[in-house]
């Protein structure tokens, strides 16, 4: 049966290595449900969701993280936004035909991975790594080696559970400022690599960890729920309308009678008529409710 959308952190007591395990189903379904993506695009978004959750858990502060793929291929953009509360949303931009068996490089073309970290307090950081690996996991491992000089392995699996899309992943990372041995890390990575997709997506986390590491001493911390959460709102749309020239807004109102602002992440529509626009220009909050 599918597992709850949760992230589990764990630590190897005899090695200076930390780990994470995440499984997502409901969150993934909510990201996909308002779009008719080809299957290869769904798979990439599933992998991005898992990767973003795992990367977010490595942050030691409150803030947001965005992991995006950009390129000149038929999938020009795929992005997941997350935060330290494990609240996620995501979207992809697709143009042209996509083969059923398209791999990552076919989808993205000449491209790169962009990781943007925005602390609630402090400066924003952005890292860019070329799409040189064959998989998203390989690209992100390269990112960690370049940006943090920390040996890191990611193991990402996608599939279906009870006919619904699901995904899971694991992360292993040598802890900074620790005297970890590369041989120990490679040993743990070899064990982790044996995880089967069905096991990761359907078994409780503790059972997965026992199957992989039953000969090791592992401390598992309390899990953290992962959920879909969109940050769009009528107020944000109103703020965006304030930035447009009055002539442009008035022209749309004259042609359409109202302005329909659509959120690509969650599918919500926000409608603004002439009275709403007048209130916005007077710095008043529009009263009309959002329309789904």
From Swiss-Prot:
* Principal location class: cytoplasm
Pfam families in the record: HSP33
Q: What does the PTM comment state?
A: Under oxidizing conditions two disulfide bonds are formed involving the reactive cysteines. Under reducing conditions zinc is bound to the reactive cysteines and the protein is inactive.
Q: List the disulfide bonds.
A: 230-232, 263-266
Which molecular function terms from Gene Ontology are attached? protein folding chaperone; unfolded protein binding
Which is one Gene Ontology cellular component term of this protein? Answer: cytoplasm
Location of the protein in the cell: Cytoplasm
Query: Which keywords has UniProt assigned to this entry?
Result: Chaperone, Cytoplasm, Disulfide bond, Redox-active center, Stress response, Zinc
InterPro entries for this protein: Heat_shock_Hsp33 (IPR000397), Heat_shock_Hsp33_C (IPR016154), Heat_shock_Hsp33_N (IPR016153), Hsp33_helix_hairpin_bin_dom_sf (IPR023212)
Biological process (GO) annotations held by this record are: protein refolding
- Write down the CDD domains for this protein, in alphabetical order: Hsp33 (cd00498)
Q: What role does this protein play?
A: Redox regulated molecular chaperone. Protects both thermally unfolding and oxidatively damaged proteins from irreversible aggregation. Plays an important role in the bacterial defense system toward oxidative stress.
Q: Which family does it belong to?
A: Belongs to the HSP33 family.
Query: What is the protein's name according to its record?
Result: 33 kDa chaperonin
Lineage of this protein's species?
Bacteria, Pseudomonadati, Pseudomonadota, Gammaproteobacteria, Enterobacterales
């Amino acid at each position: 049966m599918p597992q709850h959308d949760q992230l589990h952190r764990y630590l190897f007591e005899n090695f200076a290595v930390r780990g994470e395990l995440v499984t997502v189903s409901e969150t993934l379904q909510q990201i996909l449900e308002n779009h008719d993506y080809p299957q290869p695009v769904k798979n990439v978004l599933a992998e991005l969701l898992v990767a973003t959750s795992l990367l977010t858990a490595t942050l030691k502060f409150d803030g947001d993280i965005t992991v995006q793929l950009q390129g000149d291929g038929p999938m020009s953009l795929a992005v997941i936004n997350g935060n330290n509360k494990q609240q996620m949303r995501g979207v992809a931009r697709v143009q042209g035909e996509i083969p059923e068996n398209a791999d990552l490089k076919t989808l993205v073309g000449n491209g790169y991975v962009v990781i943007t970290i925005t602390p609630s307090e402090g400066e924003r950081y952005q890292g860019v790594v070329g799409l040189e690996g064959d998989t998203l996991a390989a690209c992100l491992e390269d990112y960690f080696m370049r940006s943090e000089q920390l040996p890191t392995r990611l193991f990402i699996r996608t599939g279906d559970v009870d006919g619904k899309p699901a995904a899971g992943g694991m992360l292993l990372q040598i802890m900074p400022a620790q005297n970890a041995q590369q041989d120990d890390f490679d040993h743990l990575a070899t064990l982790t690599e044996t995880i089967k997709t069905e096991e990761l997506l359907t078994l409780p986390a503790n059972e997965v960890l026992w199957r992989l590491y039953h000969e090791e001493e592992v401390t598992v911390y309390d899990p953290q729920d992962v959920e879909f959460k969109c940050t769009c709102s009528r107020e944000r749309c109103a703020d965006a309308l304030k930035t447009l020239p009055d002539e442009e807004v008035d022209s749309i109102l004259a042609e359409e009678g109202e302005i329909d602002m659509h959120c690509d992440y969650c599918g919500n529509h926000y409608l603004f008529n002439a009275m709403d626009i007048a209130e916005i220009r007077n710095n008043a909050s529009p009263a009309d409710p959002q329309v789904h």
